Amino acid sequence: MNVVGLILGGGAGTRLQPLTQERAKPAVPIAGKYRLVDIPISNCINSGIRKIFLLTQYNSVSLHQHIAATFRFDQFSGGHVRVLAAEQTPDSDGWFQGTADAVRRSIRYFMDDRPDIVVILSGDQLYRMDLSDIIESHIKNKADLTISTKPVDRAEAGSLGIMQTDKKGRIVNFAEKPGDTPLLKASTILALVN
């Protein structure tokens, strides 16, 4: 099974000002020598995912420098962490317009690796996770799309991507930042796609 990791570099990071004044959210230092982006990259590597792409756009120079200096695979492993920056092309004129647009515009670069599954992760969330379990569940359930969720309280729900699932775990309703809502399962920006 060929699994590729796709890590989202995020937007302006206004809630982390002044830390994001001159750097992308995933480049914010943690614990002295690490960056936020090191967590999802480590989750991928520790789960056996060796082909990783990082989508960037905002204040991304220090993030690019960190990736180039930190993540080097030997030439025989076939692994890599590659940065895919937003770019102007004949089909688009600049910045990514959200998560789906970032993935859509970058497909041509990671499809060269012919993945069976693409694991999409946020580049600025702190959690340790063995992705093997969710990949195994995705395969076992023959899903086209798997989205990780977490329960949230009503006060937090209105500012997140919120969904409702049926008894089989299938998504039946999804709303992005819906304001007041009775739905209390939030997307963690961890998704698997065939």
Language-model features: locations:
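Unchanged
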Residues: 1-194
